[in-house]
Amino acid sequence: VAPRGGNASQDDVVRGLIARGFTVDQAAAVAANIKHESNYNPAAYNPAGGGIGAHGLFQLRGDRARAFQARYGKLPSQATLDEQLDFFASNDPEEARSRRAAFAGGGSAAQLGTAVSAKYERHGNVAEDLRRGQTAQAIAAQYNQQPQVGQQININGPVTVQANDPKELMGGIQRVGGATNYNSAVR
């Protein structure tokens, strides 16, 4: 969670969206739009438009900002990264409708980024929609080039592991932290 007034990172946004069930291409599409709207700043505020200005990562205005405020008791620009991503992923009628419209056509990160710009952000600038699509494609490419680690499983308590070859088992165990002893195995 980015500190108040501080920017989140692109990775915080992409990983946060993936954790909420979005694909890499969908997450990249949304992250690209957030980059162009607020440069990943959860506290971003623009006093113009919507009667109350534009707030937060998505620069929500008017009814959308008020719906956020009704749900969380504060405007988006006063909320955390997680609260804003939760709202994007929520079943709020307008958020869900806009999100479904943006993702309905499917496609590449570029196509989704363009669609999120046109159908979720709805600023009406076709050239900007395309630019955001290009940014989404670049984000997806960066993310897909990162080495992926398997699912991390945290285990507490005594554990008995049986393996035919303890050396192979040891190659698959990764020490995350602490003073856990991995030097015993039952054969």
Enumerate the predicted regions with their spans.
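Short, polar loop/linker segments at the starts of domains and inter-domain junctions
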Residues: 70-76, 130-132, 166-176
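Long, amphipathic alpha-helical surface segments
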Residues: 123-144
